[in-house]
Amino acid sequence: MSFVPGQENAGSRSSSGNRAGNGILKKTTWADQTERGPNNQNRGRRNQPKQTATTQSNSGSVVPHYSWFSGITQFQKGKEFQFADGQGVPIANGIPASEQKGYWYRHNRRSFKTPDGQQKQLLPRWYFYYLGTGPHAGATYGDSIEGVFWVANSQADTNTRSDIVERDPSSHEAIPTRFAPGTVLPQGFYVEGSGRSAPASRSGSRSQSRGSNNRARSSSNQRQPASTVKPDMAEEIAALVLAKLGKDAGQPKQVTKQSAKEVRQKILNKPRQKRTPNKQCPVQQCFGKRGPNQNFGGSEMLKLGTSDPQFPILAELAPTPGAFFFGSKLELVKKNSGGVDEPTKDVYELLYSGAIRFDSTLPGFETIMKVLNENLNAYQNQAGGVDVVSPKPQRKGRRQAQEKKDEVDNVSVAKPKSSVQRNVSRELTPEDRSLLAQILDDGVVPDGLEDDSNV
């Protein structure tokens, strides 16, 4: 008895037979379809049998097997496709845990030409196949194969192949890929069809596909108009948009005085308890100067606010809204409503007191203690007891510069020293010594040497 994904009861194995390469999927071009060029049209020709691994040509990109699930597309270069152990198997109704094993197959898609004439390679897309099915049906679980990543449920037996039927696209549509809660999707990848509108449009897409199947059967003998839409055209457009965004995103964003002022004003317009200080609106502008009642924040953290690299680890200690209301002592106090001329309004303050408890087993405990010790009561170690923001230097006008010049001109200059005073510090020559000895013998001291008693 074989299992059919998406059905509660197991069904019999179905055969895909000879089908046209375009299948019945209307909204998505899957990797198992031939990516045809715009000039290769099948209008007026009979349907060709599905290509296999031995019959597919080198031109184009063909995967000769139909996956039960939508693909996972890479949108960032240099990212590795991988899942943690026990994760990565898509969810499908009717498939027991013992059969949830298989591999993700990398489909290397074709390249396209951009409007400026450059050749762009579309990033690969990955498809899931159950163990014993798909392009590597004969491989053993865990074999080292280029472009294959093995995944399995923790309850699955990877020594035996899965008893899953192969998908017939004429009978079964591809299932949107979903994973068990807690599964971490590889970084740089997204699930096809996982947009915001995907859940709401599933029921509509099923009814539309049923109606389109009936119309296709009734008009199978009629000539179908040629489509002017190339396969993966949406992906080409998306790639162009991503390339454009990536180019623009690489340029540094310039913050002007006007934009910084707007950000600061936007923050200050919020209630005090909703403000988030940052570089544009530092801590003191949001909450006032540091002191006994607001005693946290060193000089660096006061400038950067929540942009400080050390702040995220402190945020781990912050209580949740539930812990704030249910784990604190709260007191509602009515405040004075202001001056006599101001309109009357009731002002209240919700006073709270509580504690945040942690111990040395907390991850990053030493770093947290270091940051706390540097910022608690840091205002006491600063000049004046509080952190005062130094005023901006004012530009000097021409008048102020002239006044400054006049002040310099009026400054009295000290009288220069006498020649003897200027020479006191230099070394004495033999002639100086002889003259000095003669002066001492005569008892006559020249002017300027009366105070030099040590000479």
Swiss-Prot record:
RNA binds at residues 109, 125, 167. This is Nucleoprotein. It comes from Murine coronavirus (strain DVIM). Keywords: ADP-ribosylation, Host Golgi apparatus, Phosphoprotein, Ribonucleoprotein, RNA-binding, Transcription, Transcription regulation, Viral nucleoprotein, Virion. Residues 56-197 are annotated as: RNA-binding. Residues 9-23, 193-227 have a biased composition (Low complexity). The gene is N. ADP-ribosylated. The ADP-ribosylation is retained in the virion during infection. Phosphorylated on serine and threonine residues. Residues 260-383 form the CoV N CTD domain. Homooligomer. Both monomeric and oligomeric forms interact with RNA. Interacts with protein M. Interacts with NSP3; this interaction serves to tether the genome to the newly translated replicase-transcriptase complex at a very early stage of infection. GO terms for molecular function: RNA binding. Residues 50-61 have a biased composition (Polar residues). The lineage of its organism: Viruses, Riboviria, Orthornavirae, Pisuviricota, Pisoniviricetes. InterPro entries: N_prot_C_CoV (IPR044344), N_prot_N_CoV (IPR044345), NCAP_bCoV (IPR043505), Nucleocap_CoV (IPR001218), Nucleocapsid_C (IPR037179), Nucleocapsid_N (IPR037195). The keyword Transcription applies. The keyword RNA-binding applies. Residues 64-193 form the CoV N NTD domain.
